[in-house]
């Protein structure tokens, strides 16, 4: 029984040692795939649409007496100068409705 346990441990260590170099080789590929995905997401953000409205913004904004026009975009995340006023769906993916 001890022999079986030792052989199993040696086999697992050998498999783990063989798997680590494969994982190291995959890291550059994963980094390239991540970069490509990030560029696609940036491209998708370039396809945002803008919505402008002056008085129909929301009741809380009207209560503040704001009369300036708002520009809103549907994005994955809002910029630091924008506020999230809910969600919107673009091509079946939910995003934030960000207004300036």
UniProtKB/Swiss-Prot annotation:
This is Defensin-6. Changing residue 97 to A: Abrogates self-assembly to fibrils and attenuates agglutination of bacteria and prevention of L.monocytogenes invasion. Homodimer. Self-assembles into higher-order oligomers termed nanonets, fibril-like structures that entrap microbes. Self-assembly into nanonets seems to protect against proteolytic digestion in duodenal fluid. Interacts with Y.enterocolitica invasin and S.typhimurium fliC/flagellin; the interaction creates an anchoring site for progressive DEFA6 self-assembly into nanonets. GO terms for biological process: antibacterial humoral response; antimicrobial humoral immune response mediated by antimicrobial peptide; cellular response to lipopolysaccharide; defense response to fungus; defense response to Gram-negative bacterium; defense response to Gram-positive bacterium; disruption of plasma membrane integrity in another organism; innate immune response in mucosa. Residues 1-19 form the signal peptide. It holds the Pfam family Defensin_1. Changing residue 70 to A: Abrogates self-assembly to fibrils and attenuates agglutination of bacteria and prevention of L.monocytogenes invasion. Fails to block intestinal cell adhesion and biofilm formation of C.albicans. One of its GO terms (cellular component) is transport vesicle. Disulfide bonds join 72-99, 74-88, 78-98. Keywords: Antibiotic, Antimicrobial, Cytoplasmic vesicle, Defensin, Disulfide bond, Fungicide, Immunity, Innate immunity, Secreted, Signal. Its main location: secreted. Belongs to the alpha-defensin family. Expressed in Paneth cells of the small intestine (at protein level). Changing residue 93 to T: Perturbs self-assembly to fibrils and reduces agglutination of bacteria. Proteolytically cleaved by trypsin at Arg-68; the propeptide is stored in the tissue of the small intestine and the mature peptide is found in the luminal fluid; cleavage may occur during or after release into the lumen. The N-terminal propeptide region suppresses self-assembly and renders DEFA6 propeptide unable to agglutinate bacteria and protect human epithelial cells from bacterial invasion. The lineage of its organism: Eukaryota, Metazoa, Chordata, Craniata, Vertebrata. Changing residue 90 to T: Perturbs self-assembly to fibrils and reduces agglutination of bacteria.
């Amino acid at each position: 029984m001890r022999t079986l346990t030792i052989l199993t441990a040696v086999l697992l260590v050998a498999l783990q040692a063989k798997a680590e170099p494969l994982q190291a080789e995959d890291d550059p590929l994963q980094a390239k795939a991540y970069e490509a995905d990030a560029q696609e997401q940036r491209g998708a953000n370039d396809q945002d649409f803008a919505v402008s409205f002056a008085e129909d913004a929301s009741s809380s904004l009207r209560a503040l007496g704001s009369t300036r026009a708002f520009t809103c975009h549907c994005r994955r995340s809002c910029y630091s100068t924008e506020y999230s006023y809910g969600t919107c769906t673009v091509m079946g993916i939910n995003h934030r409705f960000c207004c300036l």
